């Protein structure tokens, strides 16, 4: 793998935050990266080989002055296998959600999973030609009613089967923890203005309370 990128370009308005007072707070939520973007960030880290060497990030609150946390985050990631990753996420898109896209670029393949919530395979090209790109794109072309899509259903089914058959689940809690670690590292880098090396320890969103005041 050479590099991968995760782009989350969504809209969250005042009404969205008014519906739950914990949203956008440092104590109970975080901002765009922690809430809206973390699933694609999780995918990026998992697909790129998981282990990270270092990250540098920038965050800001450009529009949502009624929340505590960021509404824009950008990060550059260096993985231990030599590959790179880019994260770009925002809730400032007008007037509605635009896209959630994952790009993967390797020596012998290119993948683009797009749509509003990584629900459509838009590019699938590999040198081994084991799969027909058109067939893959036709098979993975969901049209969910909202950005939540159907992605959780197979994960729940796998966990149930894992419990019933006494096997390890396909994705465990440690994978979720690693996605959380990456977002916290981006926050840390943005706050200090420096590169953050992995692993990180003793970091919490509460540390960033008041950052954009």
Describe the role of every protein-language-model region:
Residues 1-67, 193:
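Predominantly a Rossmann-like dinucleotide-binding segment in NAD(P)-dependent oxidoreductases
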Residues 1-6, 86-89, 113-115:
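Beta-strand scaffold of nucleotide-dependent catalytic cores
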Residues 182-192:
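Short arginine-rich
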């Amino acid at each position: 793998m050479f590099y991968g990128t995760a782009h989350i370009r969504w809209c969250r308005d005042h009404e969205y935050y008014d519906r739950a007072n914990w949203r956008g707070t440092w104590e109970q939520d975080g901002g765009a990266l922690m809430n809206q973007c973390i699933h694609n960030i999780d995918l990026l880290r998992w697909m790129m080989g998981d282990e990270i060497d270092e990250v540098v990030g920038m965050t800001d609150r450009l529009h949502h002055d009624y929340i505590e946390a960021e509404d824009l985050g950008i990060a550059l990631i260096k993985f231990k296998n030599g590959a790179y990753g880019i994260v770009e996420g925002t809730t400032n898109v007008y007037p509605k959600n635009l896209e959630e896209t994952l790009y993967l670029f390797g020596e012998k393949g290119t993948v683009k999973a797009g749509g509003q919530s990584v629900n459509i395979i838009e590019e699938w090209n590999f040198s081994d030609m084991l799969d027909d790109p058109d067939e893959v794109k036709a098979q993975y072309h969901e049209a969910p009613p909202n950005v939540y899509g159907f992605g959780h259903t197979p994960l729940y089914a796998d966990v149930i089967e894992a419990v019933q058959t006494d096997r390890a689940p396909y994705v465990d809690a440690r994978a979720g923890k690693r996605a959380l670690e990456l977002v916290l590292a981006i926050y840390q880098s943005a706050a200090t203005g420096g590169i953050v090396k992995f692993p990180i320890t003793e970091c919490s969103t509460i540390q960033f309370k008041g950052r954009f005041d």
